[in-house]
Amino acid sequence: MILPGSVTGSDRWYKSKYMDAMAICCRMGRPHLFVTMTCNPKWPEITAQLKKGQTHNDRPDIVSRVFKQKLAELMKDFKGGQFGEYAGHVHSIEFQKSGLPHAHIIFWMADKDAWRKTETVDKVISAEIPDESSRRSYYIYVAWTMW
């Protein structure tokens, strides 16, 4: 059976979305950032809504809603200029085998050369655990979400 491109998830739908993304790449050039956002089942917004004995697997509606809201906030930060002047993006949301959503996002920024500079990247990317004595609340949160 051949399904039309208007049916979400069909082969023609995927091909259409792929062609749209390629057209954007042709117009905008190479993307500047590739961001992956993964849902964390320990987010307080999720755990606060679960009843005693429930896990995130029991409430995929809550997990999806919280993830979508956090993704919307991330997009608002990019579009608002938190990471430089925004020019465009393409994203895809998938569900892992564990049932948790994650998004793959490519961004184009208006200043095409800014993201080639180490200083620009270092301003927004941090890969260190906060100091336990001077930034205790950040340390606790990072340690809690890591394990």
Regions found by a protein language model. Name each.
Residues 1-147:
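Extended, structured polyanion-binding interfaces
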